[in-house]
A protein has these predicted regions:
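Gram-negative bacterial Sec-dependent N-terminal signal peptides
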Residues: 22, 27-60
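Outer membrane beta-barrel
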Residues: 61-79, 91-242, 255-257, 265-268
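Outer-membrane beta-barrel and related beta-rich outer-membrane complex signature
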Residues: 82-84, 161-169, 247, 288-290, ...
């Protein structure tokens, strides 16, 4: 058998990167012929295509230069939780002052090749990961006249192309309120079980930014078309729901092969901007006998004219888990110079788990949120929220 060894060496400022890719099982060099024993590895076939980006790159028209950016949010607030009867609050007191943080450091860079194609990288470091994933997202970006390709750990087209009402304080959508308002007090009157905070984040009980099986930043391949007359389409594929995992997924042990799509419209007509979005995702390969049949849908609509903005979004999730349910978000906002104010509403329904032997609460939540912001300077904003 013949073989190929590809060695790419890229150097810059004392940093060396060495990448080797081997194919087949026999390699020749100029000094000797190495005979290798043929080994049959089951009936394994490998077909792979990839791209490697490094900073700096000696083969690029311009070297990739990574820039450092990101954001930091520091909040100080007070919460009063009602200890009403029958709410399962025994031994729990979540009222009082607290400080909460949300910060990320972003490493981004790109270069344009001689053929006009742009290749970039995006790595996001969580400064407040709360015991979770240290690297939030890490993916490769390829852009050209054909559109854009993302490869790596990142949200899907269904998530990123979704439109929801703009807010100027603590987000009522996508679960930011979870950190302040405890959901362990919300109890199903029928079976006495609590509604976990997991129902807020990336599930329609508290968010319209959703994906099937809450795939979030799992490894994905996503393609976005060019925007034509305001319309853009995005398609995503994820082998499974794991993030930062290079192990081959076991399709007999977990639901795999997720597909997600997003379609949106964004265009201005004079002084009026119109935005609309549709998204859908499902699981193609489910564990036999699971009966999960997970699917997710979301939609959004927004109008902006002058400093006034209006928006509404909806999401529904259908499967046998505790994430099953729907959510509706509506809001209005107004901005003038450095000032901005927003009023938002969210209604969430949670149908509870239908999996045999699993007890999970049903419930509803309604939240109103009034927020204001003031830009103190470039990149510095003071904000406040009452909910």
């Amino acid at each position: 058998m013949t073989g190929i060894v590809i060695v790419l060496t890229q150097e810059g400022r004392g940093t060396k990167a060495l990448v080797q890719t081997c194919r087949l099982s026999h390699v020749r060099d100029s000094r000797e012929t190495v005979k290798m024993k043929k080994v049959l590895l089951g009936t394994t076939a490998i077909v792979a295509a990839g791209m490697i980006a490094s900073a700096p790159s000696a083969i690029a028209a311009e070297k990739i230069k990574l820039s450092v950016g990101g954001y930091m949010e520091q909040w100080f607030g007070y919460v009063s939780n009602d200890d009403g009867p029958g709410n399962g609050s025994a031994g729990q007191d979540y009222s009082g002052f607290d400080v909460k943080s949300d910060s990320e450091i972003h490493f981004k860079g790109s270069t344009t090749l001689d053929n006009g194609i742009s290749v970039g990288v995006n790595v996001q470091l969580e400064a407040n990961h709360n015991g979770g994933d240290q690297i939030d997202e890490s993916y490769l970006i390829v852009k050209g006249g054909f559109g854009e390709i993302n490869l790596g750990s990142e949200n899907s087209a269904m998530y990123k192309m979704h439109y929801a009402p703009a807010e100027f304080g603590i987000s009522i959508n996508s679960g930011d309120q979870t950190g302040w308002l405890s959901t362990t007090r919300t109890v199903d009157a029928n079976n006495g079980s609590s509604i976990s905070e997991g129902g807020y984040f990336r599930a329609p009980f508290g968010s319209t930014y959703i994906e099937p099986l809450r795939a979030n930043d799992s490894e994905k391949l996503t393609y976005y078309t060019p925007r034509i007359e305001g319309f853009q389409l995005g398609l995503s594929y994820s082998p499974d729901t794991r993030q930062d995992a290079n192990g081959q997924p076991n399709r007999d042990a977990a639901d795999t092969d997720l597909v997600m799509a997003g379609l949106n419209f964004n265009r201005s007509f004079g002084s009026t901007n119109v935005r609309a979005s549709l998204g859908y995702g499902t699981v193609l390969d489910e564990v036999q006998g699971s009966g999960n049949n997970a699917s997710a849908f979301n939609a959004g609509l927004g109008l902006a004219f002058g400093g006034l903005g209006l928006g509404i979004s909806y999401a529904s999730y259908d499967d046998t888990s505790a994430n099953d349910g729907s959510g509706l978000n509506a809001g209005v906002n107004y901005s003038s110079g450095p000032w901005g104010v927003s009023l938002s509403y969210f209604h969430g329904d949670k149908d509870g788990s239908t999996t045999a032997g699993v007890v999970s609460g049903e419930g509803e939540q309604d939240t109103f949120m009034l927020s204001a912001k003031y830009a103190l300077g470039p990149g510095i904003t003071a904000a406040g929220t009452i909910a």
